[in-house]
Amino acid sequence: MVVRELFSGQLVRTWISGELSTPCPIPLGRDILYVAYFATAELKCHLALGWPLPTNVLDLFVEFRCQTNGKLLPSGNGLLGALIYFGLSAIAYTEKEAMRKLAIRGGPFSICERCELTDYCQGDVDALVELLPYLTKI
């Protein structure tokens, strides 16, 4: 799991093995805005781990679809497509697919695979930070 607090820049990188006893490593109170891209995945993770759901969720996928609904999107409406649409840097599709396949394969993961997956997650988090001003007035 990788989380960045937007205003301080503080970064939290932690490996969560999926045990229900793992406490949620981030605050989720009413004063917190939880930003994700296609937030359903993150929210399902919270439920699977027995964590509370965040009170305030901003899904940049929804915001991107609101801005682009009805437009031709040659790179799609996923995170990579949104980054490309706004001219932002994005990892290669093949690299993203390789990491997704590794995550879907499931564990056990080697130490190297854990680092690769955490780096991949951080890349998505960093991309959200770059994308946020294009989709909101925050």
Where are the language model's segments positioned?
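Short beta-strand scaffold segments in enzyme catalytic cores
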Residues: M1-E5
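Active-site-proximal helix-loop-helix substrate-binding element of RNase H-like nuclease domains
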Residues: F7-P23, D31-T136
